[in-house]
């Protein structure tokens, strides 16, 4: 196909954290990862994250860090999730070209509002 171009690129990483809770229900703190290894492993084995955030922290993509674009700009979004499947959705818009598996040599899907990103992979939408 024809080459594509874009005005800006945004990376969105979904991150899962597995933080154990103490008997009183508060999140436990450890001096280092080794000290909390067995407690953290027990939470990870449950496969239910205690926190899911974007780009490593709560609020990373809001306020002054919001992903903005001017009307008419072409934006490439690269979206990844290390552990679980996810479905990015553009409210009020669509991905003209979507590579769910992130392989730009493959033909893209066209005109999707929601697409599927497999856990452990990244996809892209333009």
Give the residues covered by each predicted segment.
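Copper-binding active sites and cupredoxin-like electron-transfer domains
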Residues: 1-126
